């Protein structure tokens, strides 16, 4: 799976003359195709054509806007904006408050810390270790190839903790087992797609998914697994299963996640 990600198409801008030619797919698209073949056999592979790819791609951005990197540096303000955007998109009755005191995660009575972002069900609080999140969200040297990395490697983990708050609000769901970890990955995929449409936060900032963000998320899910982990930061051993759960969310909706990972 890591090799499939490493040989993804390069990230291009809208004005790039090579855009749209000789495409081989983003990391997410290539992973999806690999998983189709692995689980469903040759018939699933034969069904992949430009129409199927277009339907699966939907509104996910493929190209970067002109003169933009697609990277939103991790700061306290950007973290607050992501959380605000989640609140607008999912409208929970009791939005989880945000804390930047990393020590608060240590005192949670019903969950262990999972830095750089932790969720405490007892207090319905998301706790962020900003320094660790900055490190996770730093883009590696793209000249060297390898796995995708960048801002959404970190933000996808933050989003996953918000999706645990959404699960907690439903009531009756276990948040500290393998099913919870995969359900979180699935719901993180749902939230990621929702961000393909620009969200304006109360402070006037805009949050939107950019080309390359989904690849950064799946790379993080494969390497550190935190966006596909339970409330204690524990994930399933199989990277294939983690990415598959995220893909189910990207291509589905909340109900599908709750039914699939009950």
Model-derived features with residue positions:
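Sec-exported extracytoplasmic/periplasmic mature domains
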Residues: 6-9, 35-39, 84-91, 163-171, ...
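Acidic/histidine-rich, surface-exposed loop or edge segments in extracytoplasmic proteins
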Residues: 55-73, 134-136, 168
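Acidic helix-start/capping segments at beta-turn-to-alpha-helix junctions
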Residues: 1-9, 69-71, 94-114, 204-209
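Long, well-structured alpha-helical subdomains associated
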Residues: 1-44, 195-262
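Catalytic zinc-binding patch centered on the HExxH motif and its immediate surroundings
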Residues: 102-127, 134-136
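Active-site recognition of the HExxH zinc-binding catalytic motif
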Residues: 128, 144-171, 181-185, 189
